[in-house]
Every structure is written in structure tokens, then in C-alpha cells.
């Protein structure tokens, strides 16, 4: 809230200027893999459950990590596709953590199960972001996979049970905008403290939303 009294005090007794600081380095969102176990209808990378050519090997990823460190990049968000489909994802993540990066994991959450949660917790990701784009019916329609919502929410709960910082990521389009208040209620009900809200990247399969979203905002 803007307070005129505070503004007047600042005019009469300005706060001393703080020393200039170098701007922080960029956050790198790294799509390590295009493969995904889901085929979301709004996916910008047109991911699918198949192998795609031209992806980096483990050693090539390590070389890029060295380059990013030399460039003083402080934070990495490991994404995809579905990053948990990379067999070397935990090796890569541990390497990044050992190098001093802030390391986040951006996932659809369905692969956070009894077989993977131990490794996820051992890596100690600084943050796990799980995409939820509506309540059960809407989310499953987006994902084109019945049961995806429940699988993702189980992933959220497993992360919390293992002491990981976890939050929801919501991409708003004309198809799910009306459910935003219910998503906020879900955050409260599940005691989830972090929420990332974004617009759609109009690329790949998400390009078909360009016209309807523009009309919705008019």
C-alpha cells in the first residue's frame, strides 16, 4: 500500500543511497531432455514418450556445467521434457550441486514415486517445481492422461514428506483461467508455500492457444 506520509518523510529526509552492486547472474532453465512420459496439449517443445536425436551426453553436460560456472551463472533449473527420464539426471544434479550451483528440478511430478524419491532427496534439490494446470479433470485433459493429477499431487506430498522445498507451477490459458481461485485453495489445503504463475509460451503444441488467449484478454 502506498502511504503519502512515508513519501513526505522520504522527501524531507532521503534514505542514503546504497552502494551499487553488480547485478546477479542469470538463472539458466536447462531443457536437458525432450522426451516426456506425457503429451500435454500445450507443450512448447512438442515432447513425446520417445527418444529424440541430438541430445547431450553426460560428459557433454558436464562440459556445459564448467562453462556455466566460468560465466558465473548462480542457478540452474533442470527441465525438459521430463528430466527424471534421463538415466543420468541424479549424476548431473549431484555434479551441479557439488560445483556450488543453486539447483532446481522442474518436473510434471508423475515420476516422483517410491523408486525415485530417495535419490531426489539425497541430491537435495534447492527447489522442486511441479506443474499443475488445473484441478483433476482439467489437469488430466491438459496432460491427455487420466490419473495425471493424482500422480503429480502424490509427487508433491512425497517431496514434502522428505523435507524438500516444493511448489506448484501454473501456466494460465483461456482453457484453465477460471480454475485459478481453486488452485489457490489447493495450495492452502495442501500447505504448499510456493507458487509459480506464468503465461503460456506460444510454441509447439501451445501455439494453437495464441488466438483464443488473445480473444480472452480482449
Q: Where does each model-flagged region fall?
A:
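Conserved alpha-helical substructure of the radical SAM core
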Residues: 2-127
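Radical SAM enzyme [4Fe-4S]-AdoMet core and its adjacent flexible, acidic
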Residues: 1, 102, 122-123, 131-133, ...
